[in-house]
Every structure is written in structure tokens, then in C-alpha cells.
């Protein structure tokens, strides 16, 4: 993964630069998009669909309505839950299990 790939987020009056590889997951919270990273939370006024187009679909996959998970951080998957390496859990929609599993497997084969 290229560490130099960064995103610029506008959080009210502050501009934040975050590395894509440090994003654990992205979720919709109200009318904002929240980026969960190793360094903390960052918010953006742009919607999740806009960010989904900007993020690499081979790394970020929608695991549940309104949540994009970065597959590099997935530790394990169960029937309806994803466990991240940070020990956080995310919901996994039944209809998205196969897609998430396929993207995660592809990532493992390419980068692990």
C-alpha cells in the first residue's frame, strides 16, 4: 500500500490530511460522513457516496448500509459481524457477506 495516498477532509474550518491506509472504516452519521482512523475521528460534510467514489473499491467495501470498511483492518468475519484488528466490531449485512469476503480475500492474496 502506498503511504503517500492521502485524503483532504474539511471539518468545519479545519482541513485535515489523512492517509488512506490509516482509515479503519467510514460511516454515515446524520448528514455527515465520519472517518474512523488510528489517530481518531474526522468528519466531512460530503456524503458517503461521494467518498465511496474517491476511495479504492479494492480496499473499501460496504459491509452494511452506510458503512465502508477498509479490508486491510479486518481480522475476522462471522455471520453478521466483522472484527477489526483494533477489536472494534462492525455489523455485516447478510446480502453483503459474499462481496466483503471476496474483496477481503483478494486483498489478502495481493498484499499479505
Task: For every predicted segment, state its role.
Residues 1-14, 96-112:
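Eukaryotic intrinsically disordered, low-complexity regulatory linkers and tails enriched in Ser/Thr/Pro
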Residues 1-85, 89-91:
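Conserved binding/recognition cores within well-folded domains
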Amino acid at each position: 500500500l502506498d503511504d503517500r495516498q492521502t485524503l483532504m477532509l474539511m471539518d468545519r474550518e479545519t482541513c485535515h490530511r489523512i492517509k488512506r491506509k490509516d482509515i479503519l472504516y467510514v460511516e454515515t452519521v446524520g448528514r455527515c460522513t465520519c472517518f474512523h482512523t488510528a489517530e481518531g475521528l474526522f468528519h466531512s460534510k460530503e456524503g458517503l457516496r461521494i467518498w465511496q467514489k474517491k476511495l479504492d473499491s479494492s480496499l473499501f467495501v460496504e459491509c452494511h448500509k452506510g458503512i465502508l470498511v477498509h479490508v486491510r483492518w479486518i481480522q475476522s468475519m462471522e455471520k453478521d459481524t466483522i472484527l477489526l484488528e483494533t477489536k472494534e466490531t462492525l455489523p455485516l449485512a447478510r446480502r453483503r457477506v459474499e462481496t466483503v469476503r471476496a474483496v477481503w480475500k483478494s486483498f489478502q492474496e495481493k498484499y499479505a
